[in-house]
């Protein structure tokens, strides 16, 4: 048995605010663990045949969240993988319950100033369009942190390079699952 085999038994679901690195870290984590990677946002876009920004503009956030819930449900019915969820996905009680049942959840957490700097460079996020990223993040943190705290594992990422964060996640998962990484 290789040292990462215990980490491949269940899906690893990454949760956290926008800009924390769920997709970037998720891809690298999946590669390190030899697991498939799934990005819930990309899967929603593929299922809808349009971008998230278009879904928000045409149908609104509730329609997007419903599609997101359905996509995550489908993904969690499949074999183990690393799943990058959308920032609001874990806020849905049904999605959260399913993640708790079928996956190990990891909250990637970073300082809001770091996240604001990261997302300020990217104008495709519909929740920050035309708004101050830090103000949006502060409001989201207030609403979401108590729910994110229900995650199985919490990893404080700081402003570390993605490969460092991957190592932190592997170490935290290994500790949580009670399997020594050799």
Predicted regions and their residues:
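Hydrophobic positions on the alpha1 helix immediately C-terminal to the Walker A/P-loop
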Residues: 25
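ATP-dependent small-molecule kinase phosphotransfer cores
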Residues: 36-100, 124-125, 138, 147
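Conserved lysine of the Walker
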Residues: 22
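NTP-dependent small-molecule kinase module
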Residues: 1-7, 28, 32, 142-182
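Hydrophobic anchor at the beta1->P-loop junction of P-loop NTPases
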Residues: 14
């Amino acid at each position: 048995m290789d040292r990462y085999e215990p980490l491949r038994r269940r899906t690893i679901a990454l949760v956290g605010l926008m800009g924390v690195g769920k997709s970037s870290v998720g891809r690298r984590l999946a590669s390190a663990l030899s697991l498939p990677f799934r990005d819930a946002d990309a899967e929603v876009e593929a299922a809808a045949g349009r971008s998230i920004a278009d879904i928000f503009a045409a149908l609104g956030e509730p329609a997007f969240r419903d599609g997101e819930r359905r996509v995550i449900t489908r993904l969690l019915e499949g074999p183990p993988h690393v799943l990058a969820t959308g920032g609001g996905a874990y806020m849905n009680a049904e999605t959260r319950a399913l993640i708790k049942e079928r996956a190990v959840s990891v909250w990637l957490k970073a300082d809001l100033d770091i996240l604001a700097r990261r997302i300020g460079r990217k104008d495709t996020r519909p929740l920050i369009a035309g708004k101050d990223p830090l103000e949006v993040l502060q409001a989201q943190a207030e609403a979401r942190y108590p729910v994110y705290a229900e995650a199985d594992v919490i990893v404080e990422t700081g402003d570390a390079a993605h490969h460092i964060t991957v190592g932190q996640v592997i170490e935290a998962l290994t500790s949580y699952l009670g399997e020594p990484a050799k």
